[in-house]
Amino acid sequence: MKLWGGRFKKGTDKLVNDFNSSINVDSRMYKEDIEGSLAHASMLGNQNIISKEASDRITSGLLEILKRMDNGVIEIDETSEDIHSFVEGTLTYYIGEYGKMLHTGRSRNDQVTLDLRLYLKKAITSLKQDIIALEEVLLEKANENIGTIMPGYTHMQKAQPITFAHHLLAYAEMFKRDLGRLSDCYKRVDEMPLGSGALATSTYPIDREAVARDLGFSKVTLNSLDSVSDRDYAIETLSCLSMIMMHLSRFSEEIILWCTNEFSFIELDDGYSTGSSIMPQKKNPDVAELVRGKTGRVYGDLMTLLTVMKGIPLAYNKDMQEDKEALFDGLDTVVLSLKTFCGMIKTMKVKKENMRKGAGLGFTNATDVADYLVKKGMPFRNAHEVVGEIVLQCIKDNKMIEELTMEEFKNFSPTFEEDIYHAIDLLTCVEERKVIGGPSTESVKIQIEALKNFIAENKEV
């Protein structure tokens, strides 16, 4: 069913029909389209814009269509122009002339953005729980690895000893911010545009606030031109999705490195690994690699919508039909990535001994030698110079700092005493960093408690 045609002398070319159709993309919004139509029909009846009988017949017809579509009795007609025309056409088929009254006082321009906002409200709410599920896994792994010492890196060079719990909690912080951004984005999605019409509202005495209440929106949009041409909320959602994928990608890169024989810090479960068609020994971290690769796909979705919107004058233009494919692809990709990544992290084996061995290489306790000298009264810059010389000598002699004799230490500075060996033990290096945010057991437990509280505050039961 076409929702237009009286002004035309002939039908559109079949190629144009195919080119113009969006039913394959927007059909996933059939529930939202019907929900919006139910609220609109109720308002039309309450405002005496259509008769009570017409409103009731439309309502019962829409509810029956929703039930039958949910049960698969009614299938989407892929020759329809879009989900809006399909639902209205199906309604008219079932209830006759009353169905033709549904579109009174609205346009597809405000209808489509209503559907999209309704869909996004549900999608964002669900996505936040996927993030919470990942946070729960990170919390579990962090609790198991409070005492697992590993090397921390800068510039991909070993820097200072930390713990695996500390490292995992760094990603937990990133995902906390992601959830916060989604919550903030939700506020701008949660505005009801129906009643804006094609661009200039309506001459009918419609009640936009009533529709907003029926549909669970916190408020109505304030400018009809902006309402039908606004896709900021979709772009903002894709921006949030892109940042989630960026964080997953960074984590994936480390997972991939840690799986190598060169690192051997973790082993992924067989259920989250793949093999090679030619090399029998291979166990590949394909999940992490795909997450890393799919990040570019979500970035592309964001750029698609930014590019679609960059040159559009007010108000609605058909270009905006391209918004949903990019948005839905981004949502689907992030949801699947989060769920799969969550399972990968939950089932991975941590090789604690290898992590500790790794922390013992690369002079990760060098900063602690300098701090030791400073605490003994030496200016930091002088201490830095002395320790640099110690490291250079150790490299030459192929030994670690803690392997130096007291005589060798004193050759670099008479400040050194026997307590240097305790000061540069890896466990001491970690546990002395008790500052808020640090890797010590005391600090990490505070971070774990904060994460527990965050999960409790945001998890839906």
Swiss-Prot record:
Listed InterPro entries: Arg_succ_lyase_C (IPR029419), Argininosuccinate_lyase (IPR009049), Fumarase/histidase_N (IPR024083), Fumarate_lyase_CS (IPR020557), Fumarate_lyase_fam (IPR000362), Fumarate_lyase_N (IPR022761), L-Aspartase-like (IPR008948)
NCBIfam families reported for this sequence: argH
HAMAP family linked to this entry: Arg_succ_lyase
Name of the gene encoding the protein in the UniProt record: argH
Domain of life, per lineage: Bacteria
Segments passing through the bilayer: none
PANTHER family assigned: ARGININOSUCCINATE LYASE
Catalytic activity, EC: 4.3.2.1
Name of this chain's protein: Argininosuccinate lyase
Catalytic reaction annotation: 2-(N(omega)-L-arginino)succinate = fumarate + L-arginine
